[in-house]
Amino acid sequence: MSSQSIASPSECIYKHLKKEPLLDDNLIVALMANIAIETGYTFDYKTVQRGERSDPAYGLFQLDPRGGLYDLYIDYLDYSKSDDSAESQLNMMVDILLRQWDKGVAHVGHGNVNKVLAAAEKSAEEATRAFCDHILRPGKPHMERRLAAIVGVNKSISTINDIA
């Protein structure tokens, strides 16, 4: 009898991001650290913002109907002919960061994409800050939590790579 393990959501996210050869490892860590905080470490793409709002933020990146990223995501689903999923949410961000979806790049700003990519060349910490500040732009960034999440993300990645 063989035992098969079911991949955790964070493992699935990591493996999906690693499929894109143009994504810098620092940027992958930054995306995952931000996702950890945005989802409360569940890495569940259906995560809904807690609170009393009638239009809560949603998903891996807490796409906010009031901030424009949610509407952009709806446009991306139409553009990519995809259904809502973790992969679709990740693909949208990757397509923006790799400048493969012009509408998304224009929405977040070419300069902001450049800042994130330049930060990723330096370190995962710089990339985490830049992605939060220039792409997500949360009301309360909790930057110390995002930076602390890098340690856990790196441990998870190390474990995933050891198993593979």
Annotate each predicted stretch with a short phrase.
Residues 21, 101-105, 139, 158:
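Secondary-structure transition/hinge residues
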Residues 1-11, 15, 20-21, 29, ...:
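Cell-wall glycan-active module
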Residues 29, 58-60, 128:
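Extracellular structured ligand-interaction cores
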Residues 23-29, 88, 126:
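Loop/turn elements at helix/coil->beta-strand transitions in domains of secreted/extracellular proteins
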Residues 116-164:
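Active-site or metal-binding loop neighborhoods of secreted/extracellular toxin and effector enzymes
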Residues 26-42, 93, 130-132:
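Short, functionally critical alpha-helical segments immediately adjacent to catalytic or ligand/cofactor-binding
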Residues 2-17, 36-123:
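Peptidoglycan-targeting cell-wall enzymes and recognition modules
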